[in-house]
């Protein structure tokens, strides 16, 4: 049974390391490619009001701003938000930047958004289900929630492949202290049940359904273009979606 952490984890002290680790190589490129491909399929061809909850360094927001959408980035960690501001300035794009945790967003946002992004946030929260009603209020009735989260199933599978059987017996999956392993990996079935009161899941994809399981020497030899092509081609395959290190669910709010 998962023991909840005492507080949400913010990235003030880890911003630079986090950025380099996630976005410095193939892992980050695959993540962005899958999220962007999924969103391209559903978003209407008009400017949208977008809220990025836990926006981090703003990679996804910048992509959306570049497509003409009106973007608000909400991020509690000042170094991350500063990095996002610099990224937008370098690109010559405008956005609204809000330094606030998710608990304060309803008080700071006057009306709901056409698209709410919540990517790699839930797994760092002390009580992940608590954010769901807030996300529902922030999403317009005909809008979309783009929810990406760290998949507990994939973490278990990776530990099986590595022979970490003692860790599996103790169910010690969470990262601790300064670890960049999330403190609360999510069980997709449990989350689906919690989500049901607030959203219906319309589309599901796996993010990195095979890359992270490749032997290191094969990862090093593979061309990024080939990795992206194959990850995109297999992200919704029924045998592979659930192996994604992250799962991306596109959701509509329940009435």
Predicted regions and their residues:
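A short glycine-rich, Lys/Arg-flanked "PGG" loop and its adjoining helix->strand segment in the class I
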Residues: 129-144
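Conserved class I S-adenosyl-L-methionine
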Residues: 1-46, 59, 63, 80, 144-171
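A conserved beta-strand element that flanks and buttresses the S-adenosyl-L-methionine
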Residues: 117
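Short alpha-helix
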Residues: 181-198, 204
